From Swiss-Prot:
Stretches assigned to the Ricin B-type lectin domain: 40-163
Record's function text: Receptor for secretory phospholipase A2 (sPLA2). Also able to bind to snake PA2-like toxins. Although its precise function remains unclear, binding of sPLA2 to its receptor participates in both positive and negative regulation of sPLA2 functions as well as clearance of sPLA2. Binding of sPLA2-IB/PLA2G1B induces various effects depending on the cell type, such as activation of the mitogen-activated protein kinase (MAPK) cascade to induce cell proliferation, the production of lipid mediators, selective release of arachidonic acid in bone marrow-derived mast cells.
Residue stretches spanning the membrane: 1399-1419
Domain (C-type lectin): residue spans on this chain: 240-357, 387-504, 524-645, 675-799, 821-940, 967-1098, 1123-1234, 1259-1379
Glycan attachment positions: 95, 456
Sequence motif: Endocytosis signal, positions: 1437-1443
Gene encoding the protein: PLA2R1
Cytoplasmic side: 1420-1464
Cleavable signal peptide: 1-22
Name of the protein in its database record: Secretory phospholipase A2 receptor
Disulfide bonds: 53-66, 91-108, 180-206, 194-221, 262-356, 332-348, 408-503, 480-495, 619-636, 701-798, 776-790, 842-939, 916-931, 1069-1089, 1211-1225, 1282-1378, 1356-1370
Domain remark in the UniProt entry: C-type lectin domains 3-5 mediate the interaction with phospholipase PLA2G1B.
Organism per entry: Pongo abelii (Sumatran orangutan)
Extracellular face residues: 23-1398
Amino acid sequence: MLLSPSLLLPLLLLLGAPRGCAEGVAAALTPERLLEWQDKGIFVIQSESLKKCIQAGKSVLTLENCKQANKHMLWKWVSNHGLFNIGGSGCLGLNFSAPEQPLSLYECDSTLVSLRWRCDRKMITGPLQYSVQVAHDNTVVASRKYFHKWISYGSGGGDICEYLHKDLHTIKGNAHGMPCMFPFQYNHQWHHECTREGREDDLLWCATTSRYERDEKWGFCPDPTSAEVGCDTIWEKDLNSHICYQFNLLSSLSWSEAHSSCQMQGGALLSITDETEENFIREHMSSKTVEVWMGLNQLDEHAGWQWSDGTPLNYLNWSPEVNFEPFVEDHCGTFSSFIPSAWRSRDCASTLPYVCKKYLNHIDHEIVEKDAWKYYATHCEPGWNPYNRNCYKLQKEEKTWHEALRSCQADNSALIDITSLAEVEFLVTLLGDENASETWIGLSSNKIPVSFEWSNDSSVIFTNWHTLEPQIFPNRSQLCVSAEQSEGHWKVKNCEETLFYVCKKAGHVLSDAESGCQEGWERHGGFCYKIDTVLRSFDQASSGYYCPPALVTITNRFEQAFITSLIGSVVKMKDSYFWIALQDQNDTGEYTWKPAGQKPEPVQYTHWNAHQPRYSGGCVAMRGRHPPGRWEVKHCRHFKAMSLCKQPVENQEKAEYEERWPFHPCYLDWESEPGLASCFKVFHSEKVLMKRTWREAEAFCEEFGAHLASFAHIEEENFVNELLYSKFNWTEERQFWIGFNKRNPLNAGSWEWSDRIPVVSSFLDNNYFGEDARNCAVYKANKTLLPLHCGSKREWICKIPRDVKPKIPFWYQYDVPWLFYQDAEYLFHTFASEWLNFEFVCSWLHSDLLTIHSAHEQEFIHSKIKALSKYGASWWIGLQEERANDEFRWRDGTPVIYQNWDTGRERPVNNQSQRCGFISSITGLWGSEECSVSMPSICKRKKVLLIEKKKDTPKQHGTCPKGWLYFNYKCLLLNIPKDPNSWKNWMHAQHFCAEEGGTLVAIESEVEQAFITMNLFGQTTNVWIGLQNDDYETWLNGKPVVYSNWSPFDIINIPSHNTTDVQKHIPLCALLSSNPNFHFTGKWYFEDCGKEGYGFVCEKMQDTSGHGVNTSDMYPMPNTLEYGNRTYKIINANMTWYAAIKTCLMHGTQLVSITDQYHQSFLTVVLNRLGYAHWIGLFTTDNGLNFDWSDGTKSSFTFWKDEESSLLGDCVFADTNGLWHSTACESFLQGAICHVPPETRQSEHPELCSETSIPWIKFKSNCYSFSTVLDRMSFEAAHEFCKKEGSNLLTIKDEAENAFLLEELFAFGSSVQMVWLNAQFDGNNETIKWFDGTPTDQSNWGIRKPDTDYFKPHHCVALRIPEGLQLSLCQEKKGFICKMEADIRTAEELPEKGPSHSIIPLAVVLTLIVIVAICTLSFCIYKHNGGFFRRLAGFRNPYYPATNFSTVHLEENILISDLEKSDQ
């Protein structure tokens, strides 16, 4: 039953369930009430200095008494970094058109203001360097001049970023798993959280766009409370195992998004424990063809494959194609219902459907884990080692696995079975004490699929695999397992190898009195532990009085696991905390162990919670639950917590930790400084073949026996920072991968180093990024760590301990240790010799004696020789007199533009011999000496990349025939006849061009590509260009292909597949797309050279026989330009981005937004003609995670130069090739582009879709069932299905509808290949018609027309992505889309209409096809978009109707120099 608004109003007035539509009444802000709000992410913003809180009024924000609570003081972070006010039902925003005071509350989907905010050191900052401030009259304003700090009221000084919004990915519904949009408007009310409103089944739901009635995109919300009540209606229960499963087959998420969605419901991604469970999953999907995410992953850098829910991994069914090589990026597992060996590995960033799994009872596992850490005094016979009720013996005799098994059995024992992390700790200690590196354990498998079992028949309840394990050997009947000493991890081995082995048998348990600990204390290893349950401040807890002798210090993961188990016995409340001895009370920026009355201890291990340590200067407490045992920084005096106490076992002294500092010099060209225990090496683009992803970079370092760089202490970060400054120009903004990451899903979202050193500093203190997928960090030379997507490609830095000799990979090309500095390399020869000898040596090494051309280079050289020199030596440089008393010159012939002579040392009096220059290692000053004197020296070699470009012989401009277009030194002819009968195939087109004295066009640059594309505006016919697939590296005119723009949909050299015709090899030729229905505008793809129906572009060189004129000089660029129904204004002035905004407004325009390829191409030609970069209206407020247009335009179109170009600043410009770059907003550029934004129109189609058994998505006046594209039916069955739903199979009537359909189908990724269409072949006039009798407009059908020659009985029409109409046997099973007219009732007539409460029928993905797989990657590899498609997640699946093109007569347009048509 639907609730009426009158019944809802009293609920809206409750503070515990704010809805934001009522004033609310004053209430005391009790700690309990605050905690209740904060659990929902709702907080009160308090001025740290003024102690008053922000209240939102109707038109102004003010500071008020925090204790006078009302809803207008309550705030919440929402989608897209918005700040939502509960009472005002609006979002905090900046209106740049009101610069005198832009700050206020606005509609949360307003396109006229900026609604993004971020935290920076307790400041609330927005775009254009605005931040939230307090004015003299206690009003809250935005300013760019001052800074004000804000905290969360009642949090003990915590900032408001502790409550950042976290995406909720929807379940079922019609949104394909897209995240909820908060707030969203439903029934004329803004909802900042999931709601049950409008539903009779009481399930939580949300909209995935800002207005539900407009878009009707929705889904169910992950409900954390469902973990407490078992399986609800969106879960399916296996009655035999009492396990619940949720099949999200219509969603398309990355692995981490799917993992998060399952976790939010108290579950986890699917784990498969045995063949029975796998068969259950397979049978559930037996009628489908689908590949789904499961919880299998290898994201822990220190371990192997694991299940994300912690389930032991002993059952495996890998596909033979799985690659276990370390450089492979596929680290997440999938399950395929359509192959016997169903498990595959995929790139975790791929988007797929997924299955969640939830145990109804996890208590049994928790009891076993807790009991494993309990101390039991145990007695064993001589020669055996006691540990917790069992006895163990390491046999130091190498045997095969089977021999070891029989040997243990002969001794009344068994090969060791390992049941917990506690037992791993014991085994690691045992092997270490016995100096054994590896041993057999009792795990093996002789089954297919592989199922590892213990030799003593005990259950496998724990696994601990090594990196890249378990690796399954093909064609091997039995697999055996060993454990290594360093971490106790397991490896799959050939059973015939020989190793040591450990036997295990039951021991005799002694009484508890013999534990060695006092009553109330628990023992682990050589220490006793106790919990003081009284809440105290850190100062009280650490005094040694309440917690004698000291708070706990934690040295490794085993001790942490024991303590987590210990605190589980006393935790009753969700927010219980326990003080530990870690602190930074002196605010050094580095956390250390400081137990009371004891020496400070170095930190060997950390176990932080997400976003920790948040700041320096705090004290550390361990969390009791959610998640248990994780560490968080708290205020040392204000925060109260229980205490964890630790003392040595009686009569046992605490071992003193001795930190050893190796003094071994760094090997080869690794670098360090005195006092550091490690050496570093920078791998930059000048020295390696390519930039790499984070995992590739880590594997690269591992090849040397190293890891990506970590910072064990502040001194290491300082050294790396100086190292980068010493090599690169600080203006380059280079970014280098380091080992900082949060990839491990079992690590609670906390950051860690890949070499496992502890995290002791707040590296991400100044920026908060929320729960996004940027799980790896880069380092910049200004001491900045920046989170990025791990799949981005960057340079990197490796680190290795001083006393470890680097390995030399087989692919490594050894070179003498040259040092890099700003595009040159230097070799320091420390031995002494004459100047002429070194000139020969340097020449032999293809270099020259050192030249110094700047103060920076001088400083670099001086710092190096000062460190290398003994007794203040001087070093030869490349200065020499050609004859005595001549001027000194550089020997390589470069001019002397910088000098640093010591006074009087350049040339002594009465000099009679030839002299050469040197540099002093003490002062850095230059002097001269006789060239025969022996000194050390330095060689310098230039890089291959030159500092200036070679200048080609200038070409001469000429003339073009009438009807041809001028472009640079070419004439171009665009030939697209209006009569379709005049359209050409490739051979005819080339013949036409040849008769005109030219050839089909060879596109040689981005600008030429843009010029042709902009001239195709208004056309829907694709055009031939001069490439064939038998030589796609050479143009028809013989020039090499130096520029290309291939469609991501096309596969070079592979002909299209048609189910009705087994094609022979046919020649393919290149087309340029001007129809965006199936290929992006301007992209190239191959087609049968003999196909007619296309236009073409010819080229020939301009005629230079007469007087050549450069029309760029004759016709200057006008300031106002018209193109494609848009008006542009060019601003020529030296200005910042902010000044560009204001200047455009002064002219009645806006800074330009660019939303499609046509206008991008037009502006590319304009900018290239102007010759300098211009500001455009794109900007970011969150360090490049999201970008907005300053005029409020919403578009997913981007044109970045490369992936790095979006990370260099907050404001964006376009260069002279049209490519986009970000830079600092205060930078000065020579111009900006303004435009008059197109008017936005309200929807002309207010109809709604009726509720039936399947979900519908509305477009214009029709509704579509996209959930059925994953169901496999014959044409007839699909037709009947739609008919029962009161609809028909899909028909497509225009380009806008076609574009909408393809946009929606992209959301299914590789899951959709073909769908049935409601079309038939009319034999009377040999045309294809829709079943309603209307003809198909074949000119609108993408890249290939249907061939009527192949229409035969029993063949039906399908839409194949991305090729267009295809023929298939009607009995084949394919997906389909039902279509019906929308309900004529409007949203106003249905105020209580909610989303359909029917649950989407389970559907699954069709067979993966190569063409569609490439289609799936299209937004990731789309030219200049790179990895930004996922970064622009706020624009996922947008639909923007195609422009209603009308032919534009470009010959009468602007840009005379290039666009004019000759009158000759």
